Amino acid sequence: MAEHLAEKGVTPYGYDVINEAITDGNGNKVRGVDNVFGMSGDTEPTENEADGLELNWESGHFYWGYYVKDYGVKAFQLARKYLPAETKLFINDYNLETSPSKLAALIEWVKSIDAANGSAIVDGIGTQMHIAINPTDDATSNTSIVSNLKEKVDAQFKTLAATGKLVRVTELDVDMCKYNANGEREAISSPSAAQYKCQADVYKMVFESYKTNVPEAQQSGITIWSLTDNPDEHEYWLKDGKPNLFDADNLRKWAYKGACDGIAGEDLGLKFGGEDYKAYYERQNVSPTVQ
C-alpha cells in the first residue's frame, strides 16, 4: 500500500493502522493476545501431525495475532517505516461512546504500544460513533434522548482528549431504529418530522461536544459514514435506514443543518437556505428553519 501511494504521489493525512481490535465481551481484551482468539465463530487454533495448523478463525479476523503476540507495536513500527513521515498513524474502534470499559481498554493498549516502542508512535485514536436512537413524536422525550446521549459523548471526548493524542470521529452516522425482543434492529423507515428533528439535534450535539471537549490542536476531524439515505448506499449497512445528512434524492435534511449548526457554533437560521432544502421540508409541512 505504501508503495502504491508513493507511485501515485499521494501523501495520506492519516492511516488506520489497527481497526476494531478490542472485544466487546471477554472483559474488553485485545483480539489475538492473551488467548483471546478473534470474534464470534472463532475458536482456539489447533495443530497436529496429521492436519498441521488449523487456525479455526473466520476470514478477516485477527489470525496474525496468533503468530505475533506483539502485533500492535509491530504494525505501527512498519507503518511508520514505510509511510511518509507526515502521515498520522491511528488506531480505531467502535462503541467507545457507549462502553467506557472498552474505551479504557483501548487506551491502555495504546499506552502499551507506545511503551513497547520506547516512545510515542500512535498519533491518534479514532472513534467510529455509529449512533442509534429511537426518537418519537414527543419533543420532551426526544430532548431526553439527546441529553442522555450527550453525557456519554462528552465523557468519551474528554477521556480521549486526556490521552494527548489526536482525536478523530471516523464513521459518524445517526440511525433511527428500535430493537425487537430478539435484539434485532428494525429501521424507522418513514420518520416523522419530530424524529428527523431529533436526528438533527444529535448530529449538532456531536459536533458541539467535539469542539468543546477536544482541544483544537488535537482535533483531527469528523468523517461522515456514507452520504445519502439512498437504499443503494445501505444494502448491507443500516438497511432501510435514514442515517445520513442527505435524503435518497440528494436533498439536504434537517440532519445537514444540524451538522452545519454544530460546526458553526450557532443556529444558522435563514442564513442557511436553498430551494431544494426548503422544498423538501415543505412537503412534510415542516419549517425549513429549525426553531
Predicted regions and their residues:
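Glycine-rich anion/phosphate-binding loops
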Residues: 1
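Aromatic-rich peripheral "rim/lid" segments of glycoside hydrolase catalytic domains that contact
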Residues: 4-7, 16, 20-65, 78, ...
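Loop/turn elements at helix/coil->beta-strand transitions in domains of secreted/extracellular proteins
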Residues: 7-14, 83-89, 118-124, 161-168, ...
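Aromatic-lined carbohydrate-recognition surfaces of secreted/lumenal glycan-active proteins
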Residues: 12-19, 62-103, 168-172, 221-227
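Distinct, well-ordered alpha-helical segments
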Residues: 26-30, 75, 99-116, 146
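Active-site glycine- and acidic-residue-rich loops that bind
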Residues: 67-70, 97-108, 131-153
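Glycan-recognition surfaces
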Residues: 123, 129, 223-226
